Amino acid sequence: MKDELNKVVIYTDGACSGNPGPGGWGAILLFDKNERTICGNNPDTTNNRMELTAVIEALKFLKVAYNVDLYTDSIYVKDGITLWIEKWKINGWRTASKLPVKNLELWLELDSLASFHNVTWYWVKAHAGNLYNQKADILARSQISK
């Protein structure tokens, strides 16, 4: 069934002025022949929360299941969803240091959304010339002062 799903490529980014402070997020969704941008802000947040929010909002935008290639410049998001989350679940949402997982409500939402879609996760180096990562970065930063 997963092979029959439509495909979308998503680039996400989050930004924050101060940490914590006002923040913004942006996502570029590349469908077969269309490009869609979405963005938003939060007056009091952290960079990691904005990175997670960008991914969550991009996946929420998709109303049916998709094959998703998702690109993030956040190692926190990429490693969290691909390496850490299963261990967190086993450990009662505690880290390897036995501390509560930060941003738990966002991780729970992301886990649910990611399981609805068929997501392949990619890390892309920030500010390294990737066009769509740069577009997502510009979107995210543009939302900080709104």
From Swiss-Prot:
Mg(2+) 1 binds at D13, E51, D73. Its cofactor is Mg(2+). Belongs to the RNase H family. Mg(2+) 2 binds at D13, D137. It comes from Ehrlichia canis (strain Jake). InterPro entries: RNase_H, RNaseH-like_sf, RNaseH_domain, RNaseH_sf, RNaseHI. Endonuclease that specifically degrades the RNA of RNA-DNA hybrids. Residues 4-145 form the RNase H type-1 domain. Keywords: Cytoplasm, Endonuclease, Hydrolase, Magnesium, Metal-binding, Nuclease. It holds the Pfam family RNase_H. This is Ribonuclease H. The keyword Zinc-finger does not apply. It catalyses: Endonucleolytic cleavage to 5'-phosphomonoester. Coiled coil: none annotated. Monomer. Binds 1 Mg(2+) ion per subunit. May bind a second metal ion at a regulatory site, or after substrate binding. One of its GO terms (biological process) is DNA replication, removal of RNA primer. GO terms for molecular function: magnesium ion binding; nucleic acid binding; RNA-DNA hybrid ribonuclease activity. It comes from the Bacteria.
